[in-house]
Structures are given as structure tokens and as C-alpha cells.
Regions:
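Walker B catalytic acidic pair
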Residues: 188
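N-terminal small-domain helix-loop-helix segment of the aminotransferase-like
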Residues: 2-91
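Conserved core of the PLP fold type I
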Residues: 52-176, 191-192
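Residue-level marker for buried hydrophobic side chains located in beta-strands
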Residues: 184-185
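Residues within alpha-helical segments
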Residues: 17-20, 126, 178
């Protein structure tokens, strides 16, 4: 039976309580839980969807997938994406947890994630039966580990450090991953 570790964010409670006592308040970036009110547009959409009984499609609606592609074109200047390649999930946590499994990773494979990182990267590796390795530089890994790397996570802006990877750092990561045939997945949940 697979045993997953306790969720490490729970151990941060005393630190969060101490930070909350600071006279200037606190910007809690520890887990990314939304703190702003739900926008009116989203509230209306949820109300309208309340009477849409039945299960959703497993791959989202055509309109949703097209909206994602249009967003990338409008906000990121990325054109030519295929709506059929969009994988809607409930949130990034679900995607991060399941990507290693969806890629077919398993025993003997390595998933690399940043040293200071969201714990779900490691949980996703465990769910797939792969090994999670915390490293900020693939070239620093022992050769016998590096040759087993199949997935590399980047996180920019990073949680919890706030660090932003520049183009040169991303290029080094992509080049190193290509050298071992690994997929690079950029978790950019704080990009906006």
C-alpha cells in the first residue's frame, strides 16, 4: 500500500500565527489559498451552472479549451496552440499530482522539482511510483540519477521564495532536460 507523507504545510501553523501578529500584517504565500473575494463574473457563472445537472466531460468543453488557447494568445503572445491538447483540471494541484502518472512514469524514473518547493511535486512522483528529487540544477545531479530524470518541474515565480527564473536559467534547464529526454513542465500559477 502506498503511504503518502503528512502534508507539510500543516507544520507551518505556528509560524503563520506568529507572522499574523506582525503589526504590518502578513502576505501569506505559503500555500496559495485565494484570499480575495470571488469575482462577480465567476459567481454568476457558478449560479447559472447550478442547474446544469450531469457529469462534465472529462476533457472539458470545446468552448473552455478554446478559451484557454485564446487566453494564451492574448495574454502571453503564444499562438498556434491546439485546443485538443488542453487538459482542464480542477486546479493546478490536481494537475501537478497526476502529471507523472499521465506521462507513464513509474519505478526507476526520477521527477525533479525545485529545492524549496510546493510539496505536491513530490507527492505526484510518489503516486506514480517514481522518485522525487529536489534539485535546482540538473547538472549537479549524480550521473546515475540524472540519466533517470523523466520530468523536471520549474516554478516561476516560485512558491515559497518568490524567485523568478530568467530566460537564461530556463534555457539551461530545457537544454539539460533535453539531454536526458525529460519533459519540462513550468508551474506558473503565480504568473499574474
Amino acid at each position: 500500500m502506498l503511504t503518502l507523507p503528512d502534508y507539510p504545510w500543516d507544520t507551518l501553523t505556528p509560524y503563520r500565527e506568529r507572522a499574523a501578529a506582525h503589526p504590518d500584517g502578513v502576505a501569506d504565500l505559503s500555500i496559495g489559498t485565494p484570499v480575495d473575494p470571488t469575482p462577480a463574473l465567476i459567481r454568476r457563472a457558478l449560479t447559472e451552472a447550478a442547474d446544469a445537472h450531469g457529469y462534465p466531460t472529462t476533457h472539458g468543453t470545446d468552448a473552455l479549451r478554446r478559451a484557454v488557447v485564446d487566453w494564451y494568445a492574448r495574454r502571453r503572445g503564444v499562438s498556434g496552440l491546439d485546443p485538443a491538447a488542453v487538459v482542464p483540471t480542477v486546479g493546478s494541484k490536481e494537475f501537478i499530482a497526476w502529471l507523472p502518472t499521465l506521462l507513464g512514469l513509474g519505478a526507476g524514473d526520477v521527477v525533479v522539482h525545485p529545492e524549496a518547493a510546493y510539496p505536491t511535486y513530490a507527492v505526484g512522483a510518489l503516486l506514480a511510483g517514481a522518485e522525487a528529487v529536489a534539485a535546482d540544477d540538473l547538472d549537479a545531479l549524480a550521473p546515475e540519477v540524472r540519466e533517470r530524470v523523466r520530468l523536471v518541474w520549474t516554478n516561476s515565480p516560485a512558491n515559497p521564495t518568490g524567485a523568478v527564473l530568467d530566460a537564461a536559467a530556463l534555457r539551461r534547464t530545457v537544454d539539460a532536460a533535453r539531454g536526458v529526454g525529460a519533459v519540462v513542465c513550468g508551474d506558473e500559477c503565480y504568473a499574474e
